[in-house]
Structures are given as C-alpha cells and as structure tokens.
Amino acid sequence: EASTCGSTPYSASQVRAAANAACQYYQSDDTAGSTTYPHTYNNYEGFDFAVNGPYQEFPIRTGGVYSGGSPGADRVIINTSCQYAGAITHTGASGNNFVGCSNST
C-alpha cells in the first residue's frame, strides 16, 4: 500500500519490499547488517492496525531495501505472521515516538 511518511512518498512496491525483507529477516532470525532490525515494536502509541500483533518494525527507504546503517525516520510494521500492519514515522512526533504515515494506519 502506497504511503507518505512526513513529506516522503513511498510506492506500494517500496512498502511491500520493506515488509518482505522484514519478514525474511524475522523468519530466519537474522538482522539487516550489524543492526537490530527487524525488532519488536510494542505499539506504545496505540495504533489501530488492521492485523493483530505481536509486531516487528523495519526501516523503509526510498532507494532500495534497508540493509544496515542509519535507519532514518520511517518504518514498516509487520506482525510475526508476516502480515503488513502499516507504516509509521518519527517525523513530526515528539521524542522517540511515532506518528502514522498517511494512508497506512
């Protein structure tokens, strides 16, 4: 599903690629490079996702799939059954919190 995080638009295929990568890493108990992603997302913000948790978060990028390094502000959320839950961002949120990306939560 296409989504805009802050002022950054993502196509449906970019969102799907991030979700698929998160799923593959999660299922193989692996992470992107030397990072901790994907990792547990506790949904402290209380987003009403279309699928039930538990959730994993994984960075979403405009250029290719995240493979390590700085994660940036934007995340795709999947559940541990690899269902897409939504996209969220630190952009526009206070502290280390998240807000929903448009068209996605």
From Swiss-Prot:
Cystine links in this protein are C5-C101, C23-C82
Molecular functions (GO terms): lyase activity; ribonuclease T1 activity; RNA binding; RNA endonuclease activity
Q: Which UniProt keywords apply?
A: Disulfide bond, Endonuclease, Hydrolase, Lyase, Nuclease
**Enzyme Commission number(s) from the entry:** 4.6.1.24
The reaction(s) catalysed by this protein are:
[RNA] containing guanosine + H2O = an [RNA fragment]-3'-guanosine-3'-phosphate + a 5'-hydroxy-ribonucleotide-3'-[RNA fragment]
Give the InterPro entries listed for this entry: N1-like, Ribonuclease/ribotoxin, Ribonuclease_N1/T1
Record-given protein name: Extracellular guanyl-specific ribonuclease Fl1
Organism of origin: Gibberella baccata
Which classification does the entry list for the species?
Eukaryota, Fungi, Dikarya, Ascomycota, Pezizomycotina
